[in-house]
Amino acid sequence: MKAAVINDPVDGFVTVKDVQLRDLKPDEALVDVEYCGLCHTDLHVAAGDFGEKPGTIIGHEGVGRVSKVAPGVTSLKVGDRVSIAWFFKGCGHCEYCLTGRETFCREVINAGYTADGAMAQQCIVPADYAVKVPEGLDPVEATSLTCAGVTMYKALKVAGIKPGQWVSIVGAGGLGNLGIQFAHNVFGAHVVAVDGNEDKLQAAKENGAEVLINRHDGDVDKQIQEKVGGVHAAVVTAVNASAFDQAVDSLRPDGKLVAVALPQGDMQLNIAKTVLDGIIVAGSLVGTRQDLAECFQFGAEGKVKPIVKTRKLDEINDMIQELKDNKVVGRNVVDFVHE
């Protein structure tokens, strides 16, 4: 099968090559991948930012049909459409797995990082961890919900945002665009979109953002304070440390910063402001299987609609460069159906 494999030596890019899959082990299923999106986390993995993984197949925004199951598998059957997500498998018995916080499992396995991922014609998955995709949901759109969508859905849950409150989505790309839709259409919030790209801001407006702020037009935090009196929550998807500092200063008292992006570096936090204004800072990491099932259902109901563009597998390094250059609106998705 054809797959996108991290280069050796690691250099931030991949090579499309033929790979032979191993046999299925107990509790596993084989998925014929239909589509797989390219996520910014794939860039981190390909560059070795989390530790070098040469030879690993990238991809954790995969959707496909089950073509084979190992003996004893009861959670899936041949023909089921399933997702291949970043949260690939947990231990199943730690305090996090047992209390609905499985993404924090210390023995977690991640698709496209510590296990071969979905940027390939086929992928082996742990059957009990492959969340089914509703038949009413476009599989191309489902790829974005598998990672970007559920990440933002969970982040807004963590933010505790309520109907009528203001939330800023900092970074209006693939993650941010879906976050805007979830905030507006599912949580009933008012949305401030922050980005430095006018095309992305226009897309944000079309998807429900009421206030648009171009970060090149001056201090983001001051603009937000002037326009809406500060936000109740800020969800940061922008991959630069300064965005986090600005987001904290854009909060109103008792506000909450939810960190989603993973830039290199540290975040500056004024202790006095944090205490006196009751500021809360929280990290949010993708979502659980239940979060993803809920996310898919909102997609099937038409409450969120990812911006997607299908590409060929041979274009994967061009896709990586475009994402590095901040030129992607929505998500680029590799089409394996017509490969």
PLM region descriptions:
Residues C39, S75-L76, W86-V131:
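Cysteine-cluster motifs in flexible loop/terminal segments that predominantly coordinate metals
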Residues A159-P163, L201-I280, V337-E339:
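Glycine-rich cofactor phosphate-binding loops and adjacent beta1-alpha1 units
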Residues K256-V258, Q268-K309:
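Rossmann-fold dehydrogenase core element
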Residues N197, P263, G287:
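Residues in the short beta-alpha loop(s) of Rossmann-like NAD(P)-binding domains
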Residues V82, D128, E135-Q223:
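Mid-domain Rossmann-like dinucleotide-binding core that forms the NAD(H)/NADP(H) cofactor-binding site
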